[in-house]
Amino acid sequence: MSNLWTPSIEVESVNGTREVSLTTRHLMNRNVFLQGTIDSDMANQFLSQLLYLEQELEEPVTIYINSPGGEVNAGLVIYDAIQGSNLEINMICTGMAASMAAILFCSFFSVRFSSSL
């Protein structure tokens, strides 16, 4: 997984304004990203995000995938987590989905390629 800098943004709440990472804000909006090489770190992060989102089943989750693939075992962790979830999940390919990422992407009924978000 990439160690890129993640920008912070301000969000309003009943307690005032607070700063959260953009990744956290996306998670609050039920958006999850699978970007980069699939490995055990990505699988563990994804699993923890999905388990968190399962606390509220009313709203669908959107997974954005852009990956050259990666480790089969890690990909199977992601696959099993999604297939075992009670969430309504949509998946969007925002670049490429090759190798293990293609297996994940093609295993869903609600998928699409995105030329623009």
Q: Which role fits each region the language model picked out?
A:
Residues 1-117:
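Terminal-region recognition feature
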